[in-house]
Amino acid sequence: DKLTESRKQTADKFAADVKKQLEYLDMPKINFVVDFKKGIMSSSGIDKIEFLISANPGEAPKPLAKIASGGELSRIMLGIKSILAYNDTVDTLIFDEIDTGVSGRASQKIGLKLKEVSKNTQVICVTHSAQIASNADCHFLISKDVSGSRTFTSVKQLSRDERRCELARIMGGLEITDAMLNSAEELLQTNFGK
């Protein structure tokens, strides 16, 4: 009972901290709950713990694993990892398309949060967002080519100028214009001052 009570107190603070992180990541209406149920007694106690969320006011929280989209799961994981980053022993975090279904403003916040987490843990992020990619210390371009009946994937580390061109390409359209290149440069200047 003491262990359960201690966990519940910690869980309340943890849930409040996660909610703050998710509000920052443009999920302002989310309700995040740590749910406790009695399980089978083991060496780690009797508690069976599950994360529940409701993305909209008035909805009852439901199991995170069942209702969250891929983009929501990535942002929730990022929020949790940003809280645990200083105590976590994970060497590398991988986020695949964390930008799915989010606005440019949310992408910028996600990029900043990823940069913050990367101070303590290596972060690999696959993204289609210039706002997120512009925060990276190192930028790789992944491309697929079909030759005959085979598909080949290539990975290339981008130079500073190639990076600016790639950010402009991500931002926009069939032709890279001077305005897009200037916007890409501004993102890099804002994030790195160079």
Label every model-predicted segment.
Residues D96-E97:
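Walker B catalytic acidic pair
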Residues F51, A55-G58, L73-L93:
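GG-anchored amphipathic helix commonly corresponding to the ABC/SMC/Rad50 NBD signature/C-loop
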Residues N87-D88, T100-Q108:
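Conserved D-loop-proximal element of ABC-family nucleotide-binding domains
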Residues D1-I40:
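Charged, surface-exposed helical/loop "interaction arms" that form contiguous linear patches used
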Residues I49, R105-K194:
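C-terminal lobe/lid and adjacent interdomain/linker elements of RecA-like ASCE P-loop ATPase modules
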Residues V34-K38, I53-P57, I80-S82, S143-K144, ...:
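Flexible glycine-/small-residue-rich
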